[in-house]
Regions:
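Domain-level signal for soluble alpha/beta catalytic cores
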Residues: 1-191
Length: 191
C-alpha cells in the first residue's frame, strides 16, 4: 500500500510513468532468461529438393519423369500406384501412369516408349517374384542405365530383387526425403 501511495504522489508531482517504473524496479532481481525457440520448417528440405528439380527442369527443358509400370488388374496395382505417384510428386518429378499391363513384355514396351528417366514397378508382394526379374531384364536390355524402382518392401524378397537389378524401394517406412534425394541425384539433379 505504501508503494502505491508513493507512486501516486510521484505522479501528482509530475513524474512520468517511465520514471516511476524505473524507480520501482531498482530493487527487482534479474529474472530467468528465456532463450527463444528457433523456428524450423519441416517442409524446408522438401521444398529445397523440389526447387532443385525445378532448376534442372528450367536448365535442361526436361523434367525428371518416372513411369509407373502397373502390373495386372486395377485391384492388384492401384494402392501402390497411388502411393508411388504421391511419393514422387512431392519432389516435383513428373509421373506417367499406365493401365495395368497383362504381360511383362507389354509393361517393358510401354515404359521404354514413354521415354521416362526411371521406372517404378507397382504390383503386389505375391506377384513380384514372377514379374520383377523378367521386367528388369527386358528394361535393361534396351536401356542398361535405367533407374528401376519398386513400390513396396517385401522383406523376404529384397535381396532377390536387388540382384535382379532393382535400384531402390519406396514404401511407407522409407525416409522419404532421403530416398527422393537419392533418386533425384541418380536422375542428375544437382542440390
Amino acid at each position: 500500500a505504501a508503494l502505491f501511495e508513493a507512486c501516486v504522489d510521484a505522479a501528482m508531482r509530475g513524474a512520468t510513468l517511465g520514471e516511476i517504473t524505473r524507480a520501482v524496479r531498482i530493487q527487482d532481481q534479474a529474472g530467468a532468461t528465456v532463450k527463444p525457440v528457433t523456428l524450423w520448417r519441416a517442409a524446408g528440405p522438401f521444398e529445397k529438393l523440389r526447387q532443385a528439380v525445378e532448376a534442372q527442369t528450367e536448365q535442361t527443358g526436361h523434367r525428371p519423369t518416372i513411369f509407373l509400370a502397373n502390373m495386372g488388374p486395377l485391384k492388384q496395382h492401384k494402392a501402390r500406384a497411388d502411393f508411388a505417384r504421391g511419393f514422387f510428386e512431392v519432389a516435383g518429378f513428373a509421373v506417367i501412369g499406365s493401365p495395368g499391363a497383362k504381360t511383362v513384355a507389354d509393361a517393358a514396351a510401354a515404359a521404354l516408349q514413354s521415354g521416362a528417366s526411371a521406372v517404378c514397378i507397382c504390383s503386389t508382394d505375391d506377384t513380384y517374384p514372377e514379374i520383377v526379374p523378367p521386367l528388369v531384364k527386358a528394361l535393361r536390355a534396351q536401356k542398361p542405365d535405367l533407374l528401376v524402382l519398386l513400390a513396396g518392401y517385401p522383406t523376404a524378397q529384397v535381396e532377390a530383387h536387388q540382384a535382379a537389378g532393382v535400384n531402390e524401394f519406396i514404401h511407407l517406412r522409407a525416409n522419404a526425403l532421403e530416398v527422393l534425394t537419392q533418386i533425384a541425384a541418380q536422375l542428375g539433379v544437382q542440390p
